[in-house]
Regions:
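Short, small-residue-biased leader/transition segments that mark boundaries at the very start
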Residues: 1-6
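N-terminal assembly/interaction segments in proteins that build large macromolecular machines
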Residues: 7-313
Length: 313
């Protein structure tokens, strides 16, 4: 229906505005110019000089918990979704999540289906059967969404704000030092800053080219810049690319705990390890944000209240 299309378009304009802090009319123009492609619309606004680099809209809607733990030296991060925030905060739900993390660590299942077929700790039942029981007792649907596991090197787990983020950091540690605090601080950085890449050497060439094209278009569309020599533009673009790496790559990001170290994350890791008398190398990490990428059905708030009042009759 036309009204549904209009609602969807209005929602897209709202989302783009939240991502870019650009006015509604310009957001509408950007979406019209790019046939509703959100990423292309962000680039269109940037090329016109209307928007700075926008973070992807965190379309976080599903409730649940992102949990990380180290079990017998094996790092695990897992996301389990529920229908309401209330259920996710119950002891029964958290016990389930912790036990699932233990199963991932000990059984090394290949995927979510394999995890569901595993035996549940302290029971003869499978994970699926236990979850069916929990659904009955808690009174709402629950889903294991995803998990990741590190068996090598040293893993450090961090859970932020009661399970909104679960981060697992994997480090290569030498010199017999305890790198737990280093790992926790790096994990907190990842939770807070959501880097797109770990190191600038890992940024795909296509992404580098795309960012460079945006910067060049931005200068070409600026009357003050358009007439400047190509060499000057190249120098400015190089400076913009350095800023791009600093914003989007973990090891090049400014370390948020400036009370501990002033400089980038790579510098913090090296400095902290040296103070402990050893060396630490960042290997890998996984960041789960609860409900990331899951779109929840948009309900009209007034209709929702009315529906609840009718239910109470």
């Amino acid at each position: 229906a036309a009204s549904d299309v209009y609602k969807r378009q209005a929602q897209d304009v709202k989302t783009l505005r939240e991502m870019t802090n650009v006015g509604m009319m310009d957001c509408k123009k950007a979406l019209q110019a790019t046939d509703g492609d959100m990423d292309a619309a962000v680039d269109w606004l940037r090329e016109k000089g209307l928007a700075k680099a926008a973070k992807k809209a965190d379309r976080v809607a599903a409730e649940g918990v992102a949990y990380a733990a180290v079990v017998n030296g094996i790092g695990v991060v897992i996301e389990v979704n529920s229908e309401t925030d209330f259920a996710a905060k119950t002891d029964a739900f958290m016990d389930l999540v912790k036990n699932l993390a233990t199963v991932v660590a000990t059984e090394n299942p290949a995927d979510v289906d394999a995890l569901k077929a595993c035996k549940y700790p302290g029971s003869n039942l499978t994970v699926t059967e236990i979850m069916q029981e929990k659904v009955m007792s808690i009174g709402e649907n629950m889903q294991i969404r995803r998990f990741a596991r590190f068996a090598d090197n040293t893993s450090v787990a961090y859970v932020h704000a009661g399970g909104t983020h679960g981060v697992l950091v994997n480090l290569a540690v030498e010199g017999g030092i305890d790198a737990t605090e280093i790992g926790k601080n790096v994990a907190m950085q990842i939770a807070a800053m959501s880097p797109k890449y770990w190191d600038k050497s890992q940024v795909p060439q296509a992404d580098v080219d795309k960012e460079l094209a945006v910067q060049v278009a931005l200068m070409d569309n600026d009357p003050k810049m358009a007439s400047k020599p190509a060499a000057v533009k190249e120098k400015i673009a190089a400076g913009k690319m350095a800023a791009f790496y600093k914003e989007s790559c973990l090891l090049q990001q400014e370390f948020v705990r400036s009370d501990l170290y002033k400089g980038d994350v790579a510098g913090y890791i090296a400095d902290a390890a040296k103070k402990l008398g050893g060396s630490v190398k960042f290997v890998d990490a996984v960041r789960f944000q609860t409900g990331e990428g899951i779109e929840k059905k948009q309900e009209d708030f007034a209709a929702e209240v009315a529906a609840q009042m009718n239910m109470g009759k």
